[in-house]
A protein has these predicted regions:
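Terminal targeting signals and extreme-terminal segments of soluble enzymes
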Residues: 1-74, 80-128
Length: 128
């Protein structure tokens, strides 16, 4: 079962520059809110929160269209792929049916006690 999280975003006044569009840093924070909701749901479904933390090792963002103050903003988040010890999160910022930006984040599962990467929990794999 693919897990797709849709997160409505309430843009803040400070997100907008003098041209009236959301800056790139604000958009990264929108992506972060979507990732947080994805992991909260994943941990709720699997109980793997305390056992397996994941850390970001790579982020790539592409920007296609402006986000304006009057836009209704939603982040769509899903797990795109899972490797042995890493997973790739795919996200889009949508304003209605218009994709404004896209992000791909690679995360590695990591054991902070041993300071080693560890396998992705098997129970996460069913949500790709």
């Amino acid at each position: 079962m693919a897990l797709i999280i849709r997160t409505p975003i309430q843009p803040r006044f400070a997100d907008f520059d003098s041209f009236g569009h959301a800056n790139n840093i604000a958009q990264q924070s929108y992506f972060d809110v979507g990732k947080a909701e994805l992991f909260q749901e994943l941990w709720r479904l699997t109980g793997a929160l305390k056992r397996i933390p994941a850390m970001i090792v790579s982020v790539q963002n592409d920007f296609f269209a402006q986000i304006r103050m009057e836009d209704s903003v939603e982040v769509v988040t899903r797990i795109d792929s899972i490797g042995e010890k890493s997973l790739t999160i795919a996200q889009s910022i949508m304003c209605g049916d218009r994709e404004c930006s896209r992000s791909r984040t690679v995360m590695v599962c990591y054991d902070s006690e041993t300071q080693q990467s560890v396998p992705v929990p098997d129970e996460w794999r069913e949500y790709v």
